Amino acid sequence: MFDQLDIVEERYEQLNELLSDPDVVNDSDKLRKYSKEQADLQKTVDVYRNYKAKKEELADIEEMLSETDDKEEVEMLKEESSGIKAELPNLEEELKILLIPKDPNDDKDVIVEIRAAAGGDEAAIFAGDLMRMYSKYAESQGFKTEIVEASESDHGGYKEISFSVSGNGAYSKLKFENGAHRVQRVPETESGGRIHTSTATVAVLPEVEDVEIEIRNEDLKIDTYRSSGAGGQHVNTTDSAVRITHLPTGVIATSSEKSQIQNREKAMKVLKARLYDMKVQEEQQKYASQRKSAVGTGDRSERIRTYNYPQSRVTDHRIGLTLQKLGQIMEGHLEEIIDALTLSEQTDKLKELNNGEL
């Protein structure tokens, strides 16, 4: 571990020198690239330097203890030594976590897609509930949300809806939401009071830069049409909605807000995210055949969570977490679930780094 930390610190110093180089300062791409790399290493270097300083301080105390017979001084030095010895294991654990390879998508904005699955109208209503839950969570984190495309249900909620979430670390917070979400409750239209089970699927796609995926203009088919709302009524009187089809894969992205220019930009953003996601999913499927992590495979069909309304209970099946806080969670208070999933992922990766042993 300490060899790795020495390499990280050395690279950090190299970046300091590079960021002082006039050639780099005058090259905006290099400046942005090196500045981001340095920022990513900053926390690790700070903690490692603090750790080394504590080790040196401890060595100095041990040396002073060997040179003094003064009882009062010995007692004081031993107290200082005990305090530092108690700190070191915590710093070591923090360094282990900081050395875990970071998901390259963690800092990115995301496209969230929610689709009503089994359960008819109730599934669509639940899809709307999930949309509201994520919107409230995003707001609490200082993220910005914007609807890209929505197909409303006649009885409330959405048949499907996609929206962007923008803000530093959006993907790191929402990536665990991939999968099938199940709700158990009595629908408002149910006169007999029977509990129904419905599902909605959630896909969280990191937004990608042009350099990460190449899309040729000749591979695109772009159509415009009039957007419609619930019940099929036309929302716009002009052909402002946009549908973009990627011909080689058949992947389609649409956006149906009021501005055709904005719709084209939004649809392209979604198309890039979906094509990138296809590529990532293929790689993950190969990897998942060798190993299944504690937080699941990320498969969209995998049931990840159940929301039980009669018992006010939410259960995340990947880590066996059950919380009797359904009301709070549906109001966007997802921190406890997301923190637990993040910790589970970190523990899993630490096991890998330690060859299966913590």
Curated annotation (Swiss-Prot):
<keyword id="KW-0648">Protein biosynthesis</keyword>
<dbReference type="InterPro" id="IPR005139">
    <property type="entry name" value="PCRF"/>
</dbReference>
<dbReference type="Pfam" id="PF03462">
    <property type="entry name" value="PCRF"/>
</dbReference>
<dbReference type="Pfam" id="PF00472">
    <property type="entry name" value="RF-1"/>
</dbReference>
<keyword id="KW-0963">Cytoplasm</keyword>
<keyword id="KW-0488">Methylation</keyword>
<comment type="similarity">
    <text>Belongs to the prokaryotic/mitochondrial release factor family.</text>
</comment>
<dbReference type="InterPro" id="IPR000352">
    <property type="entry name" value="Pep_chain_release_fac_I"/>
</dbReference>
<dbReference type="GO" id="GO:0005737">
    <property type="term" value="C:cytoplasm"/>
</dbReference>
<dbReference type="InterPro" id="IPR045853">
    <property type="entry name" value="Pep_chain_release_fac_I_sf"/>
</dbReference>
<comment type="function">
    <text>Peptide chain release factor 1 directs the termination of translation in response to the peptide chain termination codons UAG and UAA.</text>
</comment>
<dbReference type="InterPro" id="IPR050057">
    <property type="entry name" value="Prokaryotic/Mito_RF"/>
</dbReference>
<dbReference type="InterPro" id="IPR004373">
    <property type="entry name" value="RF-1"/>
</dbReference>
<feature type="modified residue" description="N5-methylglutamine">
    <location>
        <position position="233"/>
    </location>
</feature>
<protein>
    <recommendedName>
        <fullName>Peptide chain release factor 1</fullName>
    </recommendedName>
</protein>
<dbReference type="GO" id="GO:0016149">
    <property type="term" value="F:translation release factor activity, codon specific"/>
</dbReference>
